[in-house]
Each structure stands twice: as structure tokens, then as C-alpha cells.
Amino acid sequence: YIHEPHRIFACDPDGQLLAEITFPFSASEVVNINHTYVHPALRGQQIADTLIRLALADIRAQGWRYTPTCAFAVRWLARHPDES
């Protein structure tokens, strides 16, 4: 996975986006987990779970807080309160 500020993603060797999560600032020191994508051919392999865990680790490492607006993130965090 490639980590950029406010984004984690993976591409295939041709540069096609395979998976992505974005978490831009919505306020000072608060990011919005607003988008999660996994290529249809790769769904069901828990890639989105990995992305959100990586994003949460990055967010915590920066000392930021977060709000989820992405439907997947909202559901995932509700199912994993111990990781939120």
C-alpha cells in the first residue's frame, strides 16, 4: 500500500487503482474518513478492512481525531468498536 497524506491506496503495475481510502481534514486536527474503494474483482478479500485499519493507525500516529462519513467506514467502525 502507498501512504500519502490523507490517502492510502494500491495500484496494479499498469497504474490502475485497485483500492483506496481517503481521510482529508474537515476541521483542525479532525479528518473525515470519506471514501473507501476496492476494485470489484478484489472485493470479499478484506482489503477494505485492511485499508481502514491502516488509516486509523495513520490518524492515531498524527494525533488526529476522525469522523466517518463513508458508509463503509461508518458500518465498519460500528462493528469494531474496540478498534475505533
Question: Predicted segment positions?
Answer:
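C-terminal structural segments of small proteins and small subunits
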Residues: D58-S84
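Conserved N-terminal entry element of GNAT/NAT acetyltransferase domains
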Residues: Y1-I2
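A short, internal acetyl-CoA/4′-phosphopantetheine-binding micro-motif in the GNAT/acyltransferase core
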Residues: T36-R43
